[in-house]
Amino acid sequence: MFKIDIVRSYGISKLYLKEVMIMHGKICCFFGHRDAPDTLADDLYTAAEEMVLLEGVTTFLVGGHGNFDFLAAQTVRRLRMVYPHIRLVLVAAYASALRSPRVKEGGFDDAFVPDTLAKVPYKAAIVCRNRWMAQQTDFVIAYVIRAEGGAYTAVEYARKKGKKVCLI
């Protein structure tokens, strides 16, 4: 079904997202401020559902840091009740994040650290992970209200890479 590789230093599975895209549709990732309000839940659901119905998205990537990522993952889990073919993938910045009970019980179809982050300094890992996600994705759903910070930087990078960005 999916081609799976074992990431040498982490001992966890990694999806080859290009194959997923070809075989199962398009990819959408989420970028947003960690202090995002819970009131975004309905807007996130609407935006993600439009990605499924109008753009053919079947795989959603989330980062797992902060409230926005929590809301995004929760949204995809809700969407899976209606669209069981969609996938939720956690792209972690650190291997230690994969051992968290939240990840193990979080309803993710896969969770991994991109192998390109193996030698990245700890403080740069989230920025590098966000760039990796922006490179892999077709679409971005974002919550950015400040022209600063990691979410803003990730969205700007995705735009430079020609990705379609949906701001909520």
Task: Cite the ranges covered by each PLM segment.
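Short, Lys/Arg-enriched N-terminal segments with co-localized hydrophobic residues
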Residues: 4-22
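Acidic/glycine-enriched connector segments
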Residues: 22-168
